[in-house]
Amino acid sequence: MSPPRHVLITGMSGLIGGLVRRSLSSRCTVRALNRSPIDGVDTVRADLNDLDAIPPAFDGIDTVVHLAAYLGDDPSGHLSTNITGTYHVFEAARAAGVRRVVYASSGAVAAGYEADEPYRALVEARWDDVPAGRAPITTDDPIRPNGLYAATKAFGEALARDYADSHGLSMICLRIGRVLPGDRPRDPREAAVYLSHRDAVQAVERCIDAPEDLRFAILFAVSANRGRYRDLEHARRTIGFVPQDGADWPP
């Protein structure tokens, strides 16, 4: 797929949204769908829960990067934003004839594996307890969400599969690792699932620029961390994502 000229980003006021906006602005026309205005960006102000209010944001858009999500403690927030809101974004994209949606899923969809060895040893940086030749978790393995947020992200992946199959949209689900404001891990678990700022931007841009015939994919996005247990080979083969950074613990 040649680089799209018109990209809509939901959740641009968040950390990843801001990083992606700054990178894309030099080569694309970028629009935000956000509840609050974004300085210097064409912003359609609307709530994702209002399907009647969001369609103007999708006019003339090639690619949607859906980053908006609720991460708090209120279950109703997860249901309204991460389930209903995600459905509304996908449906508005379909109705507008958008070519591709890049859906920000989460590595938390597989974080339940951290309760088991050797993954627990990896996220605790118990290097002597990690067996040689261990196989990473891949996107072919069963999901193991570690909470309601993760479960809603798994729902988004399933819905993306349906929109690819039933409506012909190109849907790429990116299981994003831990992106931190300070861009450095603060504990061994963060070091295992860390995704640097520049690797996060690279992963999203690789999804945007992936071949046009890529109909559906679920991909992990983490940096090249010593404690990494999530597969990166599939992302390398599918979109050419090769992390430039990595974390160790102790740092």
Residue ranges: model-predicted function:
Residues 4-27:
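N-terminal Rossmann NAD(P)H-binding glycine-rich loop of SDR-like oxidoreductase domains
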Residues 32-37, 48:
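N-terminal Rossmann-fold cofactor-binding loop
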Residues 45-84, 92:
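NAD(P)H-binding glycine-rich loop region in Rossmannoid oxidoreductase-like domains
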Residues 49, 77-88, 96, 151-154, ...:
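Glycine-rich NAD(P)-binding loop of the Rossmann-fold in SDR/ketoreductase-type enzymes
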Residues 88-146:
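Conserved Rossmann-fold NAD(P)-dependent oxidoreductase catalytic core, especially the SDR/UDP-sugar
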Residues 147, 157-182:
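Conserved beta-loop-beta element that borders a ligand/cofactor-binding pocket
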Residues 165, 175-183, 194-216, 224:
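Alpha-helical substrate-binding/gating segment
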Residues 216-242:
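Conserved C-terminal active-site "lid" loop/helix of NAD(P)H-dependent oxidoreductases
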